[in-house]
């Protein structure tokens, strides 16, 4: 199955198995959108704008193979619990963000981590077993200093203790401290190409009307070890119906993969 993205004179076909969604969750004013902005364009915005829900898409050409990463930057207020549950169900990798100078935001991350594990476990019919999920818990604003800290490092690290699919980082989106390292570890845990990390691919800047022109991206000759990444200016949040179909297809693929593994072992 291929996902086809079309614009202008160019068509990009991304295999379904190479399409992923990253979901960013946390309380309001903890810096979720700032971390996403660092990932997409390396910039930091000082002005705070409340997020209802932002959707972004980044397309990669890594050694000739196409990959797609959708990024869902969620609201910290979560006025619609059903939509947040749907966002969790569609997620492949997760970033849970709290502010090191805000104890309540850390408590929210603990609740979110529990909810994600419960929702994903139910999806896999493993209600008594934690789902294996690539997840980073991110303590943001470490540039504020120790006097402002309300969450000890040792306490935050307990949330990831004993889980090889979960890691903890203290970062500063403002100073761009540990942000690249955090994404590198997250993608490594998810078994995604390392080149999807912000620092490990060439960024292609494109004009809105020329985003998928053959020469800048999809028909460009790439060297064997080259990796390119491009933020799509046309990304739209999929409909609820599309998300439900996405979940169904993902569960089906995972089931088929487990059956293949059983046959191989036998």
Swiss-Prot record:
Q: Where is the lipid attached (S-farnesyl cysteine)?
A: 263
> SMART domains under this entry?
RAB, RAN, RAS, RHO
Q: Which GO terms describe its biological process?
A: locomotory behavior; positive regulation of phosphatidylinositol 3-kinase/protein kinase B signal transduction; positive regulation of protein sumoylation; signal transduction; synaptic transmission, dopaminergic
Q: What does the entry list as the binding residues for GTP?
A: 26-33, 73-77, 140-143
Functional summary from the UniProt entry: GTPase signaling protein that binds to and hydrolyzes GTP. Regulates signaling pathways involving G-proteins-coupled receptor and heterotrimeric proteins such as GNB1, GNB2 and GNB3. May be involved in selected striatal competencies, mainly locomotor activity and motor coordination.
Q: State the protein's name.
A: GTP-binding protein Rhes
Localized where? Answer: Cell membrane
Quaternary assembly: Monomer (Potential). Interacts with PIK3CA and UBE2I. Interacts with GNB1, GNB2 and GNB3. Interacts with HTT; interacts with mutant HTT (mHTT) with a much higher affinity than wild type HTT.
Which residues get removed as pro-piece?
A: 264-266
Query: CDD domains, per this entry?
Result: Rhes_like (cd04143)
Q: Which Pfam families match?
A: Ras (PF00071)
Q: What else is known?
A: Reduces cell survival in striatal cells with Huntington disease by binding to mutant Huntington disease protein (mHTT; poly-Gln region with 82 repeats) and inducing sumoylation of mHTT.
PTM info: Farnesylated. Farnesylation is required for membrane targeting.
Keyword Transmembrane helix belongs to the record? no
Q: Which residues carry this modification: Cysteine methyl ester?
A: 263
Q: Which keywords accompany this UniProt record?
A: Cell membrane, GTP-binding, Lipoprotein, Membrane, Methylation, Nucleotide-binding, Prenylation
- Principal place of residence: membrane
Which family would the database say this protein is a member of? Belongs to the small GTPase superfamily. RasD family.
Q: What is the lineage of its organism?
A: Eukaryota, Metazoa, Chordata, Craniata, Vertebrata
**Could you tell me the membrane topology recorded for this protein?**
Lipid-anchor
Per its UniProt entry, which superkingdom is the organism in? Eukaryota
The record's section on NCBIfam families has: small_GTP
Q: Where is this region: Interaction with GNB1, GNB2 and GNB3?
A: 189-235
Motif Effector region: chain residues: 48-56
What tissue specificity does the UniProt entry give?
Pancreatic endocrine cells (islets of Langerhans).
